[in-house]
């Protein structure tokens, strides 16, 4: 049985031309790639004992794309049925295959755009909005942001570069990406206006009805009054940087590690560098993206659509890097705001990592891995020196990072060798992090599970996939207590908290709502810090147990209940 992603086969495909060529190549050439990928994936499903639902969804989703591209419409219903069977969340289960069914019927019946618009409104409108609403809004957002020039730019500036480095011997998933891009270009893009209009009609109908899920999260919260007898508590924010002007800090405010593992005491808030003058515009685009995902037609969302629609191929790379840099700039401050909300006794320690935002990956080496490992050990040692009680880790890593970088730089003899090398190098980092955390038994570490709707332990994420007595891994629920469609899950994900449209600070003091397990884990950090502040004599294990024992079971979700956890410790609120 396949028990981890590392056990899945790695394959390469020899291209005749650069990936961007296939965006406009004769269809027969793309069809040949589709046949190769389809044969390999089907062989895996037939011969390997794969039980991980997320992996099966990835396989079946690719096979569905290949069938649609090839015009094998008779295969679509069966693949959709298999895909739905692997969906264990109500939202994705409801929406899976609806669009594929419409496109299949449109092609088989040679229907026009008006028919497509009507069918989209009819079929998506028939779904339970409580389950399907977020998926419908997300699909509409993705369609509205489709820009073939942007896709062309990504191919030319990223995939082509990787293919040149590898002498056109590329990972099989690049071949699948080529087919998927042609499918979108040929089948979806011509119907974009009709598809968006149909989905907009569904969104508008439910907006008019003002259907909202009940909020069970907010009543569970509690704040500590400044006048209450409590003690200061050190809270580590191990993240991309924090604007410490917004928070009270520990005596030593923090430590910084660059992307290569080197430590400094500067740049606790990540510098924007040359992008600094454009911060107001970048902030608007991030806000616009969140509004766009929520199907809100705000000035910020309209500005985002205008910018994306106007992108030329040569601007794709710079736009992606701008968005990546901006996300890193805001992330840590937003997380910190959640972690210390309602706790005047919290003192923030910024454990800043200056992760790279460029599209080109680092060049892997054992020296790099050992520097990062040493950086992890030094960072945890600084937590002990500052006597922190709880540290939030809203980030994750895996061997896939190394495997991608090795592939990009064409290191290793073949795909399987790169997998081996990646695991070897990543183990240096993973083991150092695990051992350092285990060596700080009085500190409670809180990790975000991930946002890929997959299994943290199957993917072997760190820190989310680790099992340590002083670690809690957190999944994301919405305010109604339902698991979000994006949240990573698995046996190491032991508690859930609100990670949906959580409002917190940006650098400079403005506020914004963001989604993710990155927003869920600091909710648990927040609870732990409050418990430590109110009863400083509590041990790490007492606080961890109170958090877990206070959570309410809701299916596979165990939703944190801060008030109940406090009551279990005899804390009167």
Give residue ranges: language-model regions.
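Residue-level signature for tetratricopeptide repeat
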Residues: 62, 66-69
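Substrate-binding/access-modulating region of protease and related hydrolase catalytic domains
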Residues: 322, 356-462, 510-515, 519-521
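Subtilisin-like peptidase catalytic core
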Residues: 19-26, 68, 115, 119, ...
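Subtilisin-like serine protease catalytic core
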Residues: 220-371, 386, 468-470, 480-482, ...
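Helix-turn-helix repeat elements of alpha-solenoid scaffolds
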Residues: 27-43
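N-terminal domain-start motif of subtilase-like serine proteases
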Residues: 105-116, 203-237, 242-251, 318-328, ...
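Hydrolase catalytic cores
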Residues: 130-164, 353, 499-563
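Extracellular S/T/G-rich loop segment that most often corresponds to the catalytic His/Ser-adjacent loop
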Residues: 442, 448, 456-533, 537
């Amino acid at each position: 049985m396949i028990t981890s992603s590392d056990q899945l086969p790695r394959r390469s495909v020899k291209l005749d031309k650069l990936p961007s060529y296939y965006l406009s190549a004769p269809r027969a050439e793309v069809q040949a790639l589709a046949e190769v990928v389809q044969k390999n994936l089907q062989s895996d499903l037939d011969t390997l004992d794969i039980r991980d639902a997320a992996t099966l969804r990835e396989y079946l989703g690719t096979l569905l794309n290949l069938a649609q591209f090839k015009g094998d419409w008779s295969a679509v219903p069966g693949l959709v049925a298999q895909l739905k069977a692997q969906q264990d969340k109500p939202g994705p289960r409801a929406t899976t295959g609806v669009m594929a069914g419409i496109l299949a019927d449109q092609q088989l019946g040679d229907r026009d755009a008006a028919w497509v618009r009507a069918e989209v409104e009819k079929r998506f409108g028939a779904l339970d909005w409580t389950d399907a609403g977020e998926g419908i809004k997300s699909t509409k957002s993705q369609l509205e942001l489709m820009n073939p020039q942007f896709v062309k730019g990504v191919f030319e500036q990223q995939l082509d570069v990787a293919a040149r480095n590898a002498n056109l011997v590329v990972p099989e998933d690049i071949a699948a990406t080529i087919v998927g891009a042609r499918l979108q270009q040929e089948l979806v893009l011509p119907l974009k206006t009709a598809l968006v209009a149909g989905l907009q009609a569904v969104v508008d109908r439910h907006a008019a009805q003002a259907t909202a899920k009940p909020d069970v999260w907010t009543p569970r919260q509690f704040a500590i009054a400044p006048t209450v007898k409590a003690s200061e508590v050190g809270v580590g924010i191990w993240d991309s940087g924090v604007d410490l002007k917004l928070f009270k800090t520990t005596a030593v405010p923090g430590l910084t590690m660059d992307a290569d593992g080197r430590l400094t005491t500067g740049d606790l808030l990540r510098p924007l560098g040359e992008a600094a003058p454009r911060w107001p515009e970048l902030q608007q685009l991030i806000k616009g993206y969140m509004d766009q995902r929520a199907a809100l037609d705000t000035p910020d969302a309209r500005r985002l659509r205008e910018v994306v629609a106007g992108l030329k191929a040569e601007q794709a790379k710079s736009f992606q890097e701008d968005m990546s840099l901006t996300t890193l700039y805001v992330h840590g401050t937003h997380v910190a705001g959640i972690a210390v909300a309602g706790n005047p006794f919290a003192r923030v320690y910024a454990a800043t990592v200056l992760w790279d935002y460029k599209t080109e990956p680092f060049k892997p080496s054992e020296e790099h891995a050992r520097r990062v490992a040493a950086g992890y050990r030094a960072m945890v040692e600084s937590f002990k020196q500052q006597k922190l009680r709880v540290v939030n880790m809203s980030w994750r890593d895996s061997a896939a990072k190394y495997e991608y970088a090795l592939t990009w730089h064409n290191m290793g003899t073949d795909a399987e060798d790169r997998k081996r090398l990646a695991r070897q190098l990543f183990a240096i980092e993973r083991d150092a992090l695990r051992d350092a955390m285990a060596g700080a038994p009085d500190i409670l570490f809180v990790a975000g599970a991930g946002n890929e709707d997959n299994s943290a332990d199957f993917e072997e994420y760190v820190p989310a996939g680790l099992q340590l007595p002083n670690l809690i891994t957190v999944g994301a629920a919405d305010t109604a207590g339902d698991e979000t469609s994006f949240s990573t899950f698995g046996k190491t994900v032991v508690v859930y908290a609100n990670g949906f449209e959580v409002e917190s600070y940006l650098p400079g003091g403005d506020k914004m709502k963001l989604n993710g397990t990155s927003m869920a884990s600091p909710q648990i950090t927040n609870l732990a810090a409050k418990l430590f502040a109110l009863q400083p004599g509590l041990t790490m294990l007492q606080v961890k147990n109170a958090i877990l024992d206070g959570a309410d079971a809701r299916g596979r979700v165990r939703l944190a209940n801060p008030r109940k956890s406090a009551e279990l410790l005899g804390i009167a609120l």
